[in-house]
């Protein structure tokens, strides 16, 4: 069937597709024809956004239908993608090796419940301290790591 895809900026193209075509496949064809990256496309039919995983027939899109193309700004796409990535990582992650080692040490000295509470508080304090670091603090730390000889000389000068 013949479809017309019209971008809001005025460009348009005619496409020959099957009504069983996936919306995601159509977006790839539109990308080639109108030079709009797939991730920046939002296709609309009668004002309704089309989902990538659905087929054109799911929306009763027939021959000679006209679809509207909204081009999302790249900044918005990147924000959406990073937000989606954050949602995927919200599940509790395994603790890094340093925290695992601290947990083992705490387990030797406290009951399991107390060790867990102490570790949780330690992690909260650590995260809070990190979040309060300024750019100047980070720069100072980096200088100390990159130029330890200067730091030692300064510290010796203060101790006299």
From Swiss-Prot:
Covalent cross-link (Glycyl lysine isopeptide (Lys-Gly) (interchain with G-Cter in ubiquitin)), residues: 48
Domain Ubiquitin-like: 1-76
Domain of life: Eukaryota
GO biological process annotation, one example: tail-anchored membrane protein insertion into ER membrane
One Gene Ontology term of the molecular function aspect: protein-folding chaperone binding
GO CC entries: BAT3 complex; cytosol; nucleus
Quaternary structure (record): Component of the BAG6/BAT3 complex, at least composed of BAG6, UBL4A and GET4/TRC35. Interacts with BAG6; the interaction is direct and required for UBL4A protein stability. Interacts with USP13; may be indirect via BAG6.
Role summary: As part of a cytosolic protein quality control complex, the BAG6/BAT3 complex, maintains misfolded and hydrophobic patches-containing proteins in a soluble state and participates in their proper delivery to the endoplasmic reticulum or alternatively can promote their sorting to the proteasome where they undergo degradation. The BAG6/BAT3 complex is involved in the post-translational delivery of tail-anchored/type II transmembrane proteins to the endoplasmic reticulum membrane.
Keyword tags: Cytoplasm, Isopeptide bond, Nucleus, Transport, Ubl conjugation
PTM annotation, UniProt: Polyubiquitinated. Ubiquitination by AMFR and deubiquitination by USP13 may regulate the interaction between the BAG6/BAT complex and SGTA and therefore may regulate client proteins fate.
InterPro entries attached to this UniProt entry: Ubiquitin-like_dom, Ubiquitin-like_domsf, Ubiquitin_CS, Ubiquitin_dom, Ubl4_C_TUGS, UBL4A-like, Ubl_UBL4A-like
Protein name, UniProt field: Ubiquitin-like protein 4A
Segments passing through the bilayer: none
Cellular compartment(s): Cytoplasm, Cytosol; Nucleus
Signal peptide: none
Annotated gene: UBL4A
Region (Required and sufficient for interaction with BAG6): 99-141
């Amino acid at each position: 069937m013949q479809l017309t895809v019209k971008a809001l900026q005025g460009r348009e193209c005619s496409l020959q597709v099957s009504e069983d075509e996936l919306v995601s496949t159509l977006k790839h064809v539109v990308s080639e024809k109108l030079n709009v990256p797939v991730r920046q496309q939002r296709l609309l039919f009668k004002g309704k956004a089309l989902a990538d995983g659905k087929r054109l027939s799911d929306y009763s899109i027939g021959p000679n239908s006209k679809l509207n193309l909204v081009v999302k700004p790249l900044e918005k796409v990147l924000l959406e993608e990073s937000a989606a990535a954050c949602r995927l990582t919200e599940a509790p992650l395994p603790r890094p090796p340093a925290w695992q080692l601290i947990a083992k040490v705490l387990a030797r000295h406290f009951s399991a419940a107390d060790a867990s509470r102490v570790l949780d508080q330690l992690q909260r304090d650590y995260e809070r301290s990190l979040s309060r670091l300024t750019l100047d603090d980070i720069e100072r730390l980096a200088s100390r790591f990159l130029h330890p000889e200067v730091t030692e000389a300064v510290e010796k000068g203060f101790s006299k």
